[in-house]
Regions:
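Bacterial Sec-dependent N-terminal signal peptides
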Residues: 1-25
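Small side chains
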Residues: 10, 52, 118-120
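Short, low-complexity N-terminal intrinsically disordered segments enriched in polar/charged residues
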Residues: 19-66
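A beta-strand edge to alpha-helix "cap/lid" segment located at domain peripheries
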Residues: 21-33, 96-175
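A solvent-exposed, acidic/Ser-Thr-rich amphipathic alpha-helical stretch
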Residues: 57-124
Length: 175
């Protein structure tokens, strides 16, 4: 009887250990996936900025879903969104063409991930330099991006972006 009890206890203990191990492995896999997703989302935002600095709009469009939306808020007023890669790409190219120097410095990012959808807030300081009316002008802006991302075929893409220009300063650069 004692042997039966010990055998039964051993089987229950082993089963419990196996279940605990499976739970820990599953939890660890989810945590690793979340870390990978967070790194991928930060890389997505930084790559967007790097490509903007180089005026590589075609490559930037690869970071968006086909039906993406991008809108801008300036002075508290939201402009109508650009919808679709073609409209977004044209708007970006036209705007960046105004400047010979484009510089983005990204800061903090927070994201909430829910499966293959994520929402994020990113901060960026943008410096744009161009010639206007014969003067070398520098625009410096603090931008807060409110993004919605989707993971498609294992790759995170921007589905929606609202660029809120929280402040903006324009000054003439003296030579």
């Amino acid at each position: 009887m004692k042997n039966i009890f010990l055998s039964l206890f051993a089987v229950l203990a082993i089963t419990s250990c196996i279940q605990t191990n499976a739970y820990v492995q599953n939890k660890s896999a989810k945590e690793v996936q979340e870390i990978q997703d967070r790194i991928a989302l930060k890389n997505l935002v930084d790559t967007f900025s790097n490509l903007a600095d180089e005026k590589k709009v075609t490559e930037q469009m690869e970071l968006f879903t086909d039906d993406a939306e991008v809108s801008t808020i300036e002075n508290g007023q939201e402009r109508p969104p650009y919808v679709g890669k073609q409209a977004i790409g044209k708007a970006f190219a036209n705007y960046l063409a105004l400047f010979h120097t484009v510089y983005h410095s990204n800061g903090q990012q927070t994201v909430e991930i829910n499966g293959n959808i994520a929402k994020g807030i990113s901060y960026c300081q943008v410096v744009l330099i161009g010639n206007f009316d014969g003067k070398e002008m520098q625009r410096t802006a603090g931008v807060r991006y409110s993004d919605t991302y989707v993971k498609k075929d294992g790759k995170w893409l921007i589905k929606k972006r609202v660029s809120n220009f929280m402040y903006s300063e324009m000054k003439e650069l003296k030579k």
